Amino acid sequence: MLDLTYDTPKPRVIAGAKQDWELVIGMEVHAQVSTRAKLFSGASTRFGAEPNSNVAFVDAGMPGMLPVINEACVSQAVRTGLGLKAQINLESAFDRKNYFYPDLPQGYQISQLYHPIVGEGEVLVELGDGLARLVRIERIHLEQDAGKSIHDMDPALSFVDLNRTGVALMEIVSKPDIRSPEEAAAYVVKLRQIMLYLGTCDGNMQNGNLRADVNVSICAPGQYEKYQATQDFSHLGTRCEIKNMNSMRFIQQAIEVEAKRQIAIIEGGGTVDQETRLYDPDKGETRSMRSKEEAHDYRYFPDPDLLPLTFDQAYVDAIAADLPELPDAKKARFIRGFGLSDYDASVLTADIDAAQYFEATATKDTGKLSANWVINELFGRLKKDERQIEDSPVAPAQLASLIALIASDTISGKIAKDVFEISYTTGRDPSEIVETEGLKQVTDTGAIEAAVDQIIADNPAQVAKAQENPKLAGWFVGQVMKATGGKANPKAVNQIVAQKLGG
């Protein structure tokens, strides 16, 4: 694997009225596990079903109903942990987190406080311009999702949909390593990318399948370094948690306004209360939801209905053997094998479907050309039509055929764009289009020379100007291309024009 090295970015510094402040951010990302059934029942996880139609007795908290672990959820959590280079714990356990809410019919959530299934890991978050932040993962644990309370269907009533109750979540908890709003958003993007490659979460933030709680605090310059040396969190300031963020843009906005709120409080002589807050994008502010609870407030205790979850190393090894190539490794291979730039490789590996499409079109010799066509022409056309790459009217084999025609000088780049448009709108194969429409590039130097001679003969005044200023030779090249319908080989045209005018 190619060794990609990056510099660590400086932390975001926010100027207060009295002094500068630095941001400290930790995140808890809740990712819905991609499985057909829930964590402890066989009820479907399908999104968009009729309210309260995907609910088993155990999900509804019916008396006497016992949870049964879904092995597929366990496998997906292990798979995610391996993808984040994390420690897999061969023994973990489930605990009850006790609290009351209408959409939590059991009166508790089954989670993993004391013995999570996955321990410490890491994720490299690339930030562009040769910068990257290594964010440490503290833990990943499995837990049940809650239901959904609906308050806008009736002015006097609230409704509860339990379809989501009991759906498996992976809570991915980071260390307080993130130092700017941009890094926070990029971190969630990278987690989402890795899980999409792994197939462990579909990453759909609109449906609530990926949500983030953001812990924000501020500290004076130099205090973070003291935390690093001592692991004493008091150096980092009092943190506030912003709940249920489901947009990269909102994550960044919420961090900005929350940091400024905390700075104003401290510089005004007050103290920041540790609490859970909600971001209101319409008002551009965070507002208090409740005081931030500690673990003892939830009276955690081991779930008596569930035995400890144990498996052996062979189970982990079997999952590891089935892991796909992940984004960082694929990016490095694209740079090494196809000669791509860091930027182009990043764009192509950002989405697994795009990466697979590119690989189906490229060879070692046409890698850069293929990347240019996929990124600029195909992506641009798909964006215009609001289509995803998996819905592309141009199949990878068709684009590969077009690229081969360009690489072999059968057609020019200009003609290739016309061929691409025809293929995109009709589905026809590029080779067939070129043959049928007579679009092959003119490479006969005799024919090109004749066209050049004719244009020179017809434009003596332009010849005189071009001989005084060689930069004007481009006018003759353009006229030859126009006369040949864009079919003349541009390289040959340039050479012949230069020879004729120079002579």
UniProtKB/Swiss-Prot annotation:
**Which GO molecular function terms does the record list?**
asparaginyl-tRNA synthase (glutamine-hydrolyzing) activity; ATP binding; glutaminyl-tRNA synthase (glutamine-hydrolyzing) activity
**EC number of this enzyme:** 6.3.5.-
Q: Which SUPFAM superfamilies has this protein been placed in? A: GatB/YqeY motif (SSF89095), Glutamine synthetase/guanido kinase (SSF55931)
Top-level enzyme category: ligase
Q: Which residues form the signal peptide?
A: none
InterPro entries, A to Z? Asn/Gln-tRNA_amidoTrfase_suB/E, Asn/Gln-tRNA_Trfase_suB/E_cat, Asn/Gln_amidotransferase, Asn/Gln_tRNA_amidoTrase-B-like, GatB, GatB_C_1, GatB_Yqey_C_2, Gln-tRNA_amidoTrfase_suB_CS
Q: Subunit composition?
A: Heterotrimer of A, B and C subunits.
Family membership noted in the UniProt record = Belongs to the GatB/GatE family. GatB subfamily.
Protein name, as recorded: Aspartyl/glutamyl-tRNA(Asn/Gln) amidotransferase subunit B
